[in-house]
Design a protein with these regions (language model features):
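Structural transition elements
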Residues: 302-336, 353-357
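Surface-exposed binding/hinge segments that line
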Residues: 83, 126-169
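N-terminal lobe/hinge region of extracytoplasmic solute-binding protein
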Residues: 36-86, 115, 177-178
C-alpha cells in the first residue's frame, strides 16, 4: 500500500516526525561546535571552487585581503585599509597578522599568492581575473600596490572571495598555510574535518570557539535528524521541506535568506547546444512554477531572466519575463534551428542534493513535451563537479549564487573566455558579452555602469549562455544556544562561514 507514496510526500512527512533528543548535548566538548556539512569537500585547496561545503571549511582556515561583515558590507580583512590609487591601481595596507606556522603575513606573501593564481598552468577559479594584473608593487612588508591593466572597480570584491585567500609564500602545494581563525587538526576523507582555534589569530578575543568538528551528512534528512537529536549544533543546506518544522521547534533556530538560484548550463562545443536558438528553446520550455513547488516546497520564486535580484540597483523589470514559459515558441525555435522533431541528449545533475535532482526531473519532463529526450545522469556531488569541469554533458543542472551582489558577480557564470568550471557552460563563448563585462568592471560611474549592464543583460538573454530557473531560499539551522553565526544576505550566503570566528556554543 506504500508503493505509490512519492518522494515529496515521504520527505515532507519525515521532516515533521518528532526526533528523540540524544544525550549528546550533555556530553559536548566545551567550546567545540559540531557542524553538519551537506557533503565532504571534494577538495579544500584554497584557490579552487569545489562547492559550498569546501568554501565553509576554507573560511575556517584561511583569510583574504578583503571580506564581508554580517550586513554584507565589504570590509578590509588581512588588509587594514584599501583605497583606489590612480586610474588603474589599488593600494592595500596590511594589518599585523600571522600564518598558522607563526610567520608574519607580508606583502611578499600577497604578491606570491596572486602570481600563483594567475600562473599559466593554474587551475584557480579566479585565474582569468588575476591575469588582469599588470604588476604588484611591494614597497615594504605591509604595503601592496596592485596595478591592473585597465580600471577595475570590482577588484576589492574579487579579493573578498573565499576562493582568493592569502597563503604563506613557502607553502608546499599539498599543505597550504593559511592565516584564518582555525588550524586544520584532523580529517577522515568522506567523514569529518576537525579544526582547532589558532592562538595567534589577529583579531583579539577570536575565535570564540576552541574548535569545530565538521561532519559530512550527504543525506539531507539525516542531517536534519542529527540537528533535531542534538548530535550536531549547526547545519547548512536546510532542506526546504524541513524549514517549517525547524522554525517551530523551540530548541532550534532557522536563519534563511534568498539569493541562490537554480539554472541550466550547456555544452557549446558541439551540436545542438552550440546554437543559441536551441538554448533559448530550452529556456522557454521550462515551467518554472513546478520547480518552485517540487524542489523548494514553495520557498522560492521563478527566475526567467539573468539572476539579478529585484533588490539590486541594476535590476531591469522590463526583462524579467524574457525566458517565460512558452512551449509553442520553444518548438518554433527548434524548427528554426533545423531540429523540428527534437533530439536526445545527456542531462547531468546529482542525486546528492534533492533540489538538483528534483529540479532536473521537472526540466526533463518539460523538455520531453517539446521533443527533447534528456537522459539524466545523477552521480554524487564530487563526480558531478569533475564531469562539469570536463564538459562531459549536453545539459547540466546548476545551483549557486553570484560571487557577490554586484552584477559583475555573474561574470564567472556567463563569461565563456574563463577557464572551464562546473559552474558555467562548457565552450559557450560570446565575444561581445565578454567585452561588455570588461567594460562594466572598468567603469566607476554608477549611471554608466547601469547602462552597460542593461545592454549586457539583453545580450545574455538572447544568447542564453545559461538559463535561469528559480530563486531559492537558502537556510542554516542551529540549536538555540549557538550564537554569533549569521547567514549573510543575498548572493553572499555561501560566504557565511566567515562568521564562524564569532560563533559560540553553550
Amino acid at each position: 500500500m506504500f508503493a505509490n507514496i512519492s518522494r515529496r510526500t515521504f520527505v515532507a512527512g519525515a521532516a515533521a516526525l518528532p526526533f528523540i533528543r540524544s544525550a549528546r548535548a550533555a556530553t559536548r566538548t566545551p567550546g567545540v561546535l559540531t557542524f553538519g556539512l551537506s557533503s565532504y569537500p571534494p577538495s579544500i585547496q584554497p584557490w579552487q571552487n569545489t562547492g559550498t561545503a569546501a568554501g565553509t571549511v576554507k573560511l575556517m582556515i584561511h583569510r583574504g585581503l578583503m571580506s564581508y561583515d554580517v550586513a554584507g558590507k565589504l570590509r578590509p580583512e588581512l588588509a587594514e585599509s584599501c583605497a583606489q590609487d590612480g586610474a588603474t591601481a589599488w593600494l592595500f595596507r596590511l594589518r599585523q597578522a600571522s600564518f598558522h606556522n607563526g610567520e608574519p603575513v607580508t606583502s611578499a606573501d600577497v604578491k606570491w599568492t596572486l602570481e600563483q593564481i594567475a600562473a599559466e598552468k593554474s587551475t584557480a577559479y579566479f585565474r582569468a581575473e588575476m591575469q588582469g594584473i599588470d604588476k604588484i608593487e611591494t614597497p615594504d612588508d605591509r604595503t601592496v600596490r596592485i596595478v591592473m591593466r585597465q580600471p577595475t572597480v570590482t577588484l576589492p570584491q574579487w579579493l573578498a572571495s573565499f576562493h582568493l585567500p592569502i597563503v604563506w609564500r613557502k607553502s608546499e602545494a599539498a599543505q597550504p598555510v593559511g592565516a584564518g581563525p582555525f588550524v586544520l587538526k584532523a580529517q577522515e576523507r568522506g567523514v569529518f574535518i576537525e579544526v582547532e582555534a589558532f592562538a595567534k589569530y589577529y583579531k583579539p578575543g577570536m575565535p570564540r570557539l576552541k574548535g569545530i568538528r565538521a561532519i559530512a551528512y550527504a543525506d539531507e534528512n539525516l542531517r536534519v535528524a542529527a540537528l533535531q537529536a542534538g548530535d550536531v549544533d549547526l547545519i547548512e543546506y536546510v532542506p526546504w521541506q524541513s524549514m517549517e518544522s525547524i522554525g517551530k521547534d523551540e530548541a532550534l533556530r532557522l536563519d534563511a535568506t534568498d539569493g541562490p538560484f537554480m539554472y541550466l548550463l550547456f555544452n557549446g562545443t558541439k551540436p545542438p547546444f552550440n546554437d543559441a536558438r536551441v538554448r533559448r528553446a530550452v529556456a522557454h520550455a521550462v515551467k518554472r512554477e513546478d520547480i518552485v513547488k517540487a524542489a523548494f516546497f514553495g520557498r522560492g520564486s521563478t527566475l526567467a531572466h539573468l539572476p539579478i535580484t529585484d533588490r539590486s540597483d541594476f535590476y531591469n523589470g522590463e526583462l524579467k519575463d524574457s525566458w517565460r514559459y512558452d512551449p509553442a515558441l520553444a518548438r518554433k525555435l527548434l524548427a528554426e534551428a533545423g531540429r523540428p522533431e527534437g533530439f536526445t541528449c545527456s542531462f547531468l545533475s546529482t542525486a546528492q542534493y534533492g533540489m538538483h535532482k528534483d529540479s532536473a526531473e521537472v526540466v526533463q519532463q518539460n523538455l520531453a513535451a517539446i521533443g527533447i529526450k534528456a537522459e539524466l545522469n545523477l552521480p554524487d556531488w564530487a563526480t558531478r563537479v569533475n564531469l562539469g569541469n570536463r564538459g562531459q554533458y549536453d545539459i547540466a543542472m546548476g545551483g549557486t549564487a553570484a560571487d557577490n551582489n554586484d552584477p559583475d558577480g555573474l561574470a564567472n557564470l556567463i563569461d565563456g573566455s574563463l577557464s572551464p568550471s562546473y559552474v558555467r557552460s562548457f565552450g559557450v563563448w560570446i565575444a561581445k558579452l565578454e567585452e561588455m563585462l570588461r567594460a562594466g568592471r572598468a567603469e566607476f560611474d554608477p549611471a554608466r555602469r547601469k547602462a552597460i549592464y542593461r545592454e549586457m543583460e539583453a545580450l545574455a538573454l538572447a544568447e542564453a549562455p545559461i538559463v535561469g530557473l528559480a530563486w531559492r531560499s537558502q537556510g542554516y539551522a542551529m540549536r538555540k544556544d549557538v550564537s554569533g553565526f549569521r547567514n549573510l544576505p543575498g548572493a553572499l550566503t555561501f560566504q557565511s562561514g566567515i562568521t564562524l570566528e564569532e560563533a559560540q556554543v553553550g
